[in-house]
Amino acid sequence: MRLDKFLKITRIIKRRTIAQQLCDSDNVLVNGKAQKPSYSIKKGDELVVKYFNNTIKAKVLEIPKESLKKEDIGDYVSFEN
């Protein structure tokens, strides 16, 4: 699954176009490296998303096959503080 789509489906970022812009401006790191929106996300990848004044750290647990309900997000992404 594409990185920008994963960010949208897991509700880390609200809109896919914003996810694409963040990736293009090197504000999304996967395993410590800036990645393009087309990067193919894998189970176990560690994400760092810099969004406004926030930094979101997350680990990919599973790749969703479709849009998720809010209560199901924890099955696919583990957030760090």
Where do the PLM segments sit?
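Short linear motifs in intrinsically disordered/low-complexity regions
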Residues: 32, 46, 73-76
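A basic, amphipathic helix-loop patch mediating RNA/tRNA/ribosome contacts
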Residues: 1-43
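C-terminal structural segments of small proteins and small subunits
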Residues: 54-81
